[in-house]
Structure formats: structure tokens, C-alpha cells
Amino acid sequence: MKIIQAAVEFAPFIKAGGLGDAVYSLSKALSASHDVEVLLPFYPCIFPTVSSQVIDEKVFAYEFLGRQHASSISYSYEGMILTVITLDSQLELFSTSTIYTQDDTLRFSAFSAAAAAYIQKLNHVDIVHMHDWHTGLLPGLLKEPNRQHYPKRIFTIHNFSYRGYCSTQLLGASGISEFGLSNYQLFRDPQVSVLLKGALYCSDYITTVSPTYAQDILHDYSDYEMHDAIMARRHVFRGILNGIDDNIWNPETDSSLVANYGKNLLDSPEILFTKKEENKVALYEKLGMSPEHSPLLCIISRIVEQKGPEFMKAAILHAMENGYAFILVGKCYDEETQRKFSNLQESLTMSPNVRIILDYNEPLARLLYGAADMLCIPSHFEPCGLTQLIGMRYGTVPLARATGGLADTVTPGINGFTFSHADNFNDFFRMLSQAVTTYRHEPDVWFQLVEEGMLRSSGLSTMAMHYLEIYNSLL
């Protein structure tokens, strides 16, 4: 089967969050038995050099704000084909210092137009699988009746809150037919279109990244036209839980850890916890923290409204009042949040047990997974979440809000702790206190939580199997 995966992130080359990891993991898993090609836009200022073998190069035209020119380079990469598309005559659109900017609907619609033209040049494609609103124009362009090839189209919603509202005139610049364009337009204001809305109507099948989040989407009434769209397509909509790549997230081989360990040490828990303690000591030394504070609770997250920044601050207060260690590693994405957390960071510089690092540093994050006893994910909503899966793999017990994919993967008393209420801190503090008390006074129970998490399947092969079931059902 020839499968195209189209996205604007792909780890490790271009990544801002879990999207890049998810696209890589799925593509890698599918490539074990199928012909998988990943399409990415070229970001001149931030795309790293690809050292893999070049297997093909193309030059082609596409339509977006007139006739444009693009080129592609295809690399052989880990059993897949990685194709990077450069918008040669609109290169300025992607000449930015970050993946996401203020004109993303323009940039990514141009990429979708180029990707559609590229796909039409291929001899045969069975499936085109598109990820998130950024590629929302692509299913509409591939469904055009005048297209020579008509591959089956799968669309995955990674975050329903981001939809790609834009002007209808902008999408019309791609040459899409009036009928195709109507799938994107809002009835209440035809001058406004939504990339995600059109993708829902123009795809053969729609998925999201966990079963519970699929139900959350079906009950989302924030925009009644988006609700109508997903309800109209609910018969071809399901949630498939994301997985992680065990080869990438593996405490046995992770070079960022001072002491490696793995599931093989579950028969010798004292050795396992000694290894984690060695990582903790190294981390404390690195950050200038006092070693006597335990347990260690960490948060590794983007600091945005979705992720519950008010709960992050509350966790700091709880740690200071209860004498355990807390480390936050995360990046702010707006000036106001940056200002607030920078002030908090400065005020805690001399704290013996709390540290805030306002940047995402992967080696540090990996060491934190290996050192921490607990990982907190206090999200208001979470489509799937990968940090809790990584944490469990590293023997770090997740403390999470029971929402979306977190509710599907973290079970209280089995592999972690949860809280439900997002409108007050009482339930959150109850969860934190229960976790700290269990760690300090019930070591056998704590080990069972660690063991259950480390033995949990990564879910990657199951995820790939479910997607293959969908692909095959459409062919």
C-alpha cells in the first residue's frame, strides 16, 4: 500500500509539540510493512540539514495566488521516504524563525496547494493521511473532480481547538472549485472559511488521537457550525489512542540519563530506584537544588492556557508547603504568560526545592523523566498527551486531570493519580497530597504503580493496526 502522510511537523526535524512525535511514530510503524512517504514544507531558516540519501528530486507548478513554482527533494529515511517541498516562488512564506507565525492560514494553505500538485505527479497513491488544520485545504483539493488521481483521504484532528479560520478569498486562490470551496465556508458568513470544517466534509475518514477526546469533540458546542460538521460525519469518525516509539523513549539506552535502567530491573526494585536516584542527584547538582527534598514532582509542558498554568503555580505552592521538590520545564508562547512565569522564576531563584526552566531543552527533559518520581499533567483538556506515556515508560508516575487521552491512559490506583475538577484547586491538592503520602508511606503500593506503568505497552503497534484497518476498509 502506498501511503502519504502530510503534516507541518515531523520529529526530529521540525517539532513544536506532540504533533511532530505523533506523525513520526505512526509513519515509522506503518513503514514496517507498507510504502510510506511523508510530505513536509521546507522552512529555510530552521530546517536542519538532512544527511540521508537523496532518492528523487522534482520541479513542478502549483496554483496559489497565481501560478507558482515548487521543488521537492525526497530522502530515504529510516525505511520511509521523507519529501521536503520548497515553495520556490513563495519562499518568503516559510522564511521564519519559528514553525508557527501570525499568517499560518496563508502559509499552510500554500503548502497544501503545492502538496496536492506534488501528489498528482506520483504514479499511484492509495491513501493520503493529513494531520491537523494546517493541511485542511489538502483534502478539498484532492477531492476535486478534475484531478487525475483520486486517492482515499484520511484526516486526523490533533487539537479541535485550532481550526484555521480564514478568508474565503484566500482559499479560493488555490483554484479550488466553487463546490469544493463551499465545504469550507461558514453559512453565517460566507466570506469566512474554516480549514478544519472543509477537511471534515472532504475526507473519507476522520480520526482523533484518543477515544475520550473523540467524545469531547462530539460534545463541543463552541461553534455550532463546527459541531454540525463533525456530527454530519460522525459515522466515519473515531478516536485512536496515540502511542510512543520505544526505541526513542527508552531509559535503557537514553544517553541523557546518568544511570540507565529498564523493565528488566522490576525484579530488583531496590536497584531500579537506586538508578533513578542517581539521575535525581545529577539533576539536583545541575540545577543547584538541595538533595534532601523528596519526592521529585515535575512538569514538562508548553505553558499555555490549555495546559493549566494556574495549576502549575498551585503545584509550586503545594511543594513548598509540603517539603518536596518541584521542577517545571516549559516554554511560554505569549508575552503575558512569559512575564508572569519569569517573575515567578526570579522569585524562586534561591529556593532549595523548586526550579523553573522557561525553555524546552530535550536532554534536560529526558534527564527529568529519568530522575523524577512523579509527572504532573494538569491540562484543562488533552487530546491524547504523550508525556504521561513517556513518564510511565521511565518509571515516573503520572498525576493527571481525567480528560481526553489522559483519562484513557491514567487509571487511579493502577498506574497513577487523577483529579477531575478544573474550576477549583481542592481536587488538585487532594491528588497531590495522596500521591506524596503514597510515595512516603506506602512503598509497596508506589512500586506497583511504577511497575504497572513500565510494563504498559507503548501502544504504537496497536495504533498502526487500527489505522491500517481504516485504510483497508476504504480501498
From Swiss-Prot:
Positions that bind ADP-alpha-D-glucose: 15
Keywords from the UniProt entry: Glycogen biosynthesis, Glycosyltransferase, Transferase
InterPro entries in UniProt: Glyco_trans_1, GS/SS, Starch_synth_cat_dom
One BP annotation, GO: glycogen biosynthetic process
Enzyme class: transferase
EC number(s) from the headed UniProt entry: 2.4.1.21
GO molecular function (one): alpha-1,4-glucan glucosyltransferase (ADP-glucose donor) activity
Keyword Transferase annotated: yes
Catalytic activity: [(1->4)-alpha-D-glucosyl](n) + ADP-alpha-D-glucose = [(1->4)-alpha-D-glucosyl](n+1) + ADP + H(+)
Xref: SUPFAM superfamilies: UDP-Glycosyltransferase/glycogen phosphorylase
Pfam families listed in its UniProt record: Glyco_transf_5, Glycos_transf_1
Pathway recorded for this protein: Glycan biosynthesis; glycogen biosynthesis
Role according to the record: Synthesizes alpha-1,4-glucan chains using ADP-glucose.
Similarity comment: family membership: Belongs to the glycosyltransferase 1 family. Bacterial/plant glycogen synthase subfamily.
Record-given protein name: Glycogen synthase
